[in-house]
Each structure stands twice: as structure tokens, then as C-alpha cells.
Amino acid sequence: MNQGKIITVSGPLVVASGMQEANIQDICRVGHLGLVGEIIEMRRDQASIQVYEETSGIGPGEPVVTTGCPLSVELGPGLISEMFDGIQRPLDRFQKATDSDFLIRGVAIPSLDRKAKWAFIPKLSVGQEVVAGDILGTVQETAVIEHRIMVPYKVSGTLVAIHAGDFTVTDTVYEIKQEDGSIYQGSLMQTWPVRQSRPVAQKLIPVEPLVTGQRVIDTFFPVTKGGAAAVPGPFGAGKTVVQHQIAKFANVDIVIYVGCGERGNEMTDVLNEFPELIDPNTGQSIMERTVLIANTSNMPVAAREASIYTGITIAEYFRDMGYSVAIMADSTSRWAEALREMSGRLQEMPGDEGYPAYLGSRIAEYYERSGRVRTLGSQEREGTITAIGAVSPPGGDISEPVTQNTLRIVKVFWGLDAPLAQRRHFPAINWLTSYSLYQDDVGSYIDRKQQSNWSNKVTRAMAILQREASLEEIVRLVGLDSLSEQDRLTMAVARQIREDYLQQNAFDSVDTFTSFPKQEAMLTNILTFNEEASKALSLGAYFNEIMEGTAQVRDRIARSKFIPEENLEQIKGLTQKVTKEIHHVLAKGGI
């Protein structure tokens, strides 16, 4: 422990002298109030401290005391369904302890409840050899999540004691005799520094798709479990709704939602909606698998930087248990702005648009902690972290540094488009500018698993949309009637794909989520219409006759998005109906 004195205060940056025994990344208690801060720069005996609380009223001469520990999170039972701030203070218990709706400064509250008792069930017995990552036992944390208590990193040896029963997170529940003869006493909780990634046995190639229930994502721009995706877009384009939809319906075990510098009412929406929503995979409330980290725009700027690391560290902990985790960061632009502010106050050389020169490496550090891994431990298990980051470029300009540095790292780009949003086409993901580098892997995985020709259907549908884009210029100049019959059909089918398939209502109880079998059935119907109508045109039928003769079935295809999942056979039955009606047009002599 080292004690120094404040010499200058500049917003969230405090400079203290007499800190020669301190280290970079040490946590400090700043001033008489004991505000939480982290050392981010050392120059001789002077330390620059990033303070995670409001610094007004703090002045030169006040003491600074280091703890000798880096910024760490507590990992154990009690994380799920909880809401933390950027440095893992539990907001509901904070409010009860301080009897205030605001964050009172200098209040220290443990992240995990020290009074709550958890029923621990051992999985190993005394005398067994254990290594780091082995699962010692389980705690049923929620109806959905079984919390697996693991041997901490760098601990191994012989299990000499393990107890069943109800314990708090600080009670000793097991003892391990290590190779040097010392006894390690372990509890249900462990701590981990947030800026250090948790070790794994092996990184694996992600191949299994993350099913989100959003048709434009799952069909054209899929992300894998263990992948990384970016959602850039201007204000009002629907970034937050896309993130909420994925958090609600993604086929993962755990969701960690980090509200980083965005509006407080967006976190309020999450708190209001999530407890009422039922997870289609488990039948339980979605809050039973969710951890919320709220660091809204009216909270201290410096804590935004910590909130992203806090979220990804909690995600790594659940990944190490063998779970698939999705982490949503909304938005990484606000996090980058916090980096820019601290860099400016440190008087560092600025890079593009005032952001620090190390912006790219910091963004890479975050996204590279995602992935599919084989975890530590003698038991074989895999875990995944899927990282999805919203980016809010000013004015929707994706050439700005945060977006460009993000695109260098992630493999999926869901580009939200202001003109689409203005036309009320949601999700406003532009199918011409977005991309997914996982498309081939996911397509072959689905073809193999479902024994279907999915990747071919996706390619055909995208080709129709691209053909429509190339014809639009001609239509604007000389009108739709000047096109050939085949091109008019292409325009009609493209409109069907856009309006009846890609457009999706997040606030409709049925349309908000579409399972993969339903997506395939809907797309098959549209492509069957295109194929059969093309054949009819080649046999001499007129385009207008085909459209009039199939008006009823096309209307049913358009309404199929509102057919519940349990009535899937109704959608599949439309394929034969399409063929039948087009043959009927030919038989009537629509030539």
C-alpha cells in the first residue's frame, strides 16, 4: 500500500505525487471521500489516475491510497439477473444501502451479495487430483443456469476437503493440497483482473450459426457462435432494437448486455421488457440468463472504458464453464469517446479525429476475447463468446476511425441504412452493403445438418436483390413498363423478398422471432414462385396474367410471416399451391 497526495485535478483525471511504490493499473482510493480510481500512467513518482466517479470537490493536498490490486471483478453465484454499473457495483443493492436514486460517491459495496446462501452440490470427492478449470461442484443459480464452481487458475493438487450444503460466496467449501504442500482454501467466488483475458486450452474455428430469429441476419449475414459482428448506423436506424432482439432470442445460454454511454431509457426498456419475455429455448423468463451492465450517458465517462472489460470478463467466466455466451456492447463509439477524452487529458499525441493512436489495438483487444474455445481442465468441454458491438458514427459516416478499426477485426458487418429506416423498413440492414465472412461455413454446416440445399437458395435470393438494384436506375429513367417481361418478374420477386421476407416487426408477438425451419419454408415459397413464373414466361405466358392469376397465393405468402411456428405445415403447403396456380394460368391460355 502506497500513500500519495493529489497535485492536480482535471475532470476524471487526477495526478498524485509520492507514488513511487505504486504500479500501473493499481486501484486507488482518491481523496477524503475514497473515490475509486485506476493508475493509467506513471512518470517518476507521479501517477495519473483515471477516476471512475465524479471528481467535483476533490482538490490538491488530499490523500491517494493504492490497494496494490488491479481493477478486478468478482465471479461467482449471484451474477445472473443482476444489474451492475461499469465497475461492477450492484445498482439495486447500492440504491437500498444509500437510500438514494443517485450514485453516492465513495460508497464501497461488494459486487456479490455476502449474505445470500447458495446450495452447493459437489461433483468430485476427497482424494481426487484436480487442475485449474476442473468443475468441483454446481450451484443452481436460476431455473435455467447451473453455476459450475471451477478450480481457479494456477491452482492444482489433491482435493483434501469438499463440503455439501448452503454457503455464502465467502465461505470455504473446498481445500486443495498443492504440490508445494500448501493448502488452498477455496470458496464459491473467485476474482479476475478485467484487462487480462482468461486463459484457455485451445482456440477453435467457429462453425455453428448463432440463430437470432431475425430473417435478414440468419439468411444473408449470419454470425457464428464465437464470432464477432458490428452494427454501425446513424441515429434512429435501429441499432438498439437489433441488439435487443438478439439479446432476447439468440440460441445462447447466457446474454451479457452492456449499455455503454447510451441513453438510460434504453436500459429501462430492457428492465421492463426482459422479465416478461419467455425464452423460446427454455420456456423461462429471459432475465434468468441475462447479466446487465449499465453505464449510461449521465454516469462518469471514465467508467465507460471499464464497463466493456467488465462485461467481457464475466462472459469469459461463463464460457469457461462450457456455456455459449453472447455479449452486446451498445455502443463501442461511446467507449472510444471515453478513451479520446482520457487521452486528451493525458496530453498524448492524437490520431485520426482526435482519437488516440492506440484506438485500433484497444478495439482489437476487446473483439479478440470472443471465440470458440476448448476450456482449461481435465474434463473436455467447449465454450463460446459471440461479441456484437453497436457503432454510432456521427452522421452515419462509416469512414470515421471507430467504424473502420472495428471493420478490420470483425467478420460480420450489419450496415444499418438511414433511407431504409425512413421508409419504415426494419431491421434497416442494407443487403447490398452488409456482409458476413461466415456465410460459406454456416451454409455448409446447415446443408450438412438439415440435409437441405440452403446455401443455394440464399445465393439465388441475393442474386435477385442484386439484379433489382442494377435495374432500378433504368426504371427511374424510363419506367417499369419499358423492362422485359423477365426483368419485370425479377422486380416483383425482389419486392416480395424485401417486403414479405426481410421486413420484420419487432413488436409483433409472432413476427418478432422466426425459427430456422420457418425461414426456409418462407424463402422456398418465394423462390418457387420465381422459378415457376420464369418457366411460364418462357412458355409464352404474359407477366400481367401470371400476377393476376397468382394474386391470392402471393397474398398468402406475404401473410405467412404472421403464421405461428406450430402451424408451419400451412407455410410449406403454399409451395404446391404456387405451382398449381401458375399451371392454371397456363391452362387458361394466359399466352
UniProtKB/Swiss-Prot annotation:
One matching Pfam family, short form?
ATP-synt_VA_C
Known catalytic reactions: ATP + H2O + 4 H(+)(in) = ADP + phosphate + 5 H(+)(out)
Which SUPFAM superfamilies is this protein grouped with?
Answer: C-terminal domain of alpha and beta subunits of F1 ATP synthase, N-terminal domain of alpha and beta subunits of F1 ATP synthase, P-loop containing nucleoside triphosphate hydrolases
Q: What class of enzyme is it?
A: translocase
InterPro entries named in the record:
ATP-synt_VA_C, ATP-synth_a_Xtn, ATP_synth_asu-like_sf, ATPase_a/bsu_AS, ATPase_F1/V1/A1_a/bsu_N, ATPase_F1/V1/A1_a/bsu_N_sf, ATPase_F1/V1/A1_a/bsu_nucl-bd, ATPase_F1/V1_b/a_C
Q: Which NCBIfam families match?
A: PRK04192.1 (NF003220)
The protein's name: V-type ATP synthase alpha chain
Q: What species is given as this protein's source?
A: Streptococcus pyogenes serotype M18 (strain MGAS8232)
